[in-house]
A protein has these predicted regions:
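Gly/Ala-rich beta-loop-alpha elbow adjacent to hydrolase catalytic centers
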Residues: 95-100, 104
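Alpha/beta hydrolase fold serine-hydrolase catalytic domain that processes acyl esters and thioesters
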Residues: 1-45, 49-91, 112-255
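Short glycine-enriched nucleophile-adjacent loop
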Residues: 104-113
Length: 255
């Protein structure tokens, strides 16, 4: 609440209007979804999709994308954009960080041509790609020219799955996986500080993960992730913070 109040005081954001906040977590169908629409000007709005939160339900849903073309949050993302397009007839931009960018791209690709004709840029910040089958659809092909993709130099999440969208490499002041936080990305004169190449570590991780998912069937991937997360749930872990805290305690006790 304090941050919201401070944003309201800033000249840059005082004229913005917020609409349609939606947030849902459903463990029964493995879904974590959140979105918000912001009016930038009378004729332009931006639909912003939230990335994965701290819940393991959200993280499990992320890894479902390695074997399933469509996850529960994709359906919500598509319906949310459809609804916003019905109540607003101007230009609609889309954006999201991490899974949020993935949802933005999927939602845009899944729209009817009339809605797609009103879409502006789609900003994906260190966001996973999509299942390879989605890349073959007419809807995806139609929105690829609109998409802009940004990843840090030691990217991991932003290289997962498949994408045909060129990326801009942003310099981060953090280490390894901590670069996933956009708060660590460097800005100079109002622009991202960019780099020419990904780190060798990022390239190796990307090659290793893609090789593994290509060699394993979708059925085997589904079984692996189901067993992996069920293990975490069984020992009482509910959030990613639990994994880095309690889980390491269990490992130390075991050994």
């Amino acid at each position: 609440v304090d941050l919201t109040q401070e944003i309201g005081k800033a000249k840059r954001y005082q004229s913005l209007k917020f609409f349609g906040m939606k947030s849902e977590v459903d463990s029964d169908i493995t879904k974590q979804f959140a979105a918000l629409t912001v009016e930038i000007s009378p004729n332009v709005r931006i639909v912003i999709y939230r990335g994965t939160d701290e819940t393991l339900i959200g993280w499990k849903e992320d890894f479902m994308m390695t074997y399933s073309p469509i996850i529960p949050a994709h359906k919500d993302a598509k319906e949310y954009l459809e609804q916003q397009a019905k109540v607003f007839d101007g230009k609609i931009l889309l954006s999201g960080h991490s899974k949020g960018g993935n949802l933005a791209l999927y939602a845009a690709a899944a729209q009817e041509k009339e809605v797609q004709s009103r879409l502006g840029k789609i900003f994906c910040f260190d966001s996973p790609g999509l299942h390879r089958s989605i890349l073959e659809t007419e809807g995806y092909r139609a929105v690829v020219p609109l998409a802009m993709r940004y990843i840090p130099q030691d990217a991991l999440v932003g290289l997962l799955l498949e994408s045909e969208i060129p990326y801009v490499i942003v310099k981060s002041n953090a280490f390894a996986a901590l670069q996933h936080s956009a708060l660590t990305w460097e800005i100079e004169n109002g622009q991202f500080v960019t780099m020419d190449h990904l780190t060798k570590n990022s390239q190796l991780n990307d090659q290793t993960f893609k090789k593994w998912t290509e060699e394993v069937s979708d059925e085997e991937l589904e079984l692996f992730w189901d067993v992996f997360f069920e293990l975490l749930f069984t020992i009482g872990l509910d959030t990613i913070n639990d994994v880095f805290g309690k889980f390491m305690h269990y490992v130390q006790e075991f050994f």
